[in-house]
Amino acid sequence: MIISSSTDYRRAAQKRLPPFLFHYIDGGAYAEHTLRRNVDDLAEVALRQRVLKDMSQLDTSIDLFGEKLSMPVALSPVGLTGMYARRGEVQAARAADARGIPFTMSSVSVCPIEEVAPRLSRPMWFQLYVLKDRGFMRNALERAQAAGCSTLVFTVDMPVPGARYRDAHSGMSGPNAALRRYAQAVMHPRWAWDVGLLGRPHDLGNISRYLGKPTGLEDYMGYLGANFDPSISWKDLEWIREFWKGPMLIKGILDPDDARDAVRFGADGIIVSNHGGRQLDGVLSSARALPAIADAVKGQIKILADSGIRSGLDVVRMIALGADAAMLGRAYIYALAAAGQSGVDHLLGLIEKEIRVAMTLTSVSSISQITSELLVREP
């Protein structure tokens, strides 16, 4: 199979993965309108092509929170990454590390923080949910700091889990889910051998270490379902801001007023995100929400964006809409599932090449030159 894009990796991942895992990463909330709009709205962003400029010297690098990135891209936190490839968090993190960009470790990962961090040459980022179990939150923060994680990504758009219809149909949840997952694994022997057997343990590493006992997929659903906290407010985040010594990003911002609140709170950055269309169907796509947020807080706080990004061209579009950098989620999981670390490395190489092509054809030689001036203004 010829692989030349994240779309190709998606097809390859679908062939390799049991349906419950493919649809868990591929699906969204409710009827998935926002999931589709994330991609479609970004694809509708037209850029101004400029020609006959000397573009022989391009620089895709940026400085972000004191770190030098080879391109304006970071890997988003994705729960259960270690179910998509053998010790998947390690493989994805190594690929990001080799390409000179940050990997964000999910707090609900398969591999624990301590398994991943020592294998990298640069600090990784760490993501945390708002949970009723404040003991777990504090334990995770302490371990992340001890492991040298540089930046905290605090996800605030999951006070309750989204309604994901696909999960019930695919076997991730619903009646006889465990039996259905087992039957699917038998029908996908390459995954069953490489990940199902050789990728053990399939604990949720960070939660298991806190609870002192193994936590599998059923425990994952039960623990999170019981611990999401709908009472959370900005006040509840104050102890985290005081405890965490490094940069702190608030993930899940879609409204300019929330972005202004993040500035007042003292966050170092925000991530414009609708959780990849996995939480509330019918909200704005990140591409549509971003310009108003940038108008409200640009220059006061760093702005990152995810949801719908599938190519280097999409990265350039997001930056032109107002972001300082973009984050990849599904795209790298498709590559990881299809080809492990080498797949993620290859995808990131494609992303960087696509960024360079877009910069050349819009006549910008550095990321700082990608502004709203690149956007085609409709009459």
Curated annotation (Swiss-Prot):
Q: Provide the Gene Ontology terms for cellular component.
A: plasma membrane
Which keywords does the record carry?
Cell membrane, Flavoprotein, FMN, Membrane, Oxidoreductase
> EC annotation?
1.1.-.-
- Identify the cofactor(s): FMN
Show the InterPro entries listed in the entry.
Answer: Aldolase_TIM (IPR013785), Alpha-hydoxy_acid_DH_FMN (IPR012133), FMN-dep_DH (IPR000262), FMN_HAD (IPR037396), FMN_hydac_DH_AS (IPR008259), LldD (IPR020920)
The record, for PROSITE patterns, names:
FMN_HYDROXY_ACID_DH_1, FMN_HYDROXY_ACID_DH_2
What family classification does the UniProt entry report for this protein?
Belongs to the FMN-dependent alpha-hydroxy acid dehydrogenase family.
Q: Would you tell me the protein name for this molecule?
A: L-lactate dehydrogenase
Q: What is the lineage of its organism?
A: Bacteria, Pseudomonadati, Pseudomonadota, Betaproteobacteria, Burkholderiales
Gene symbol here is lldD
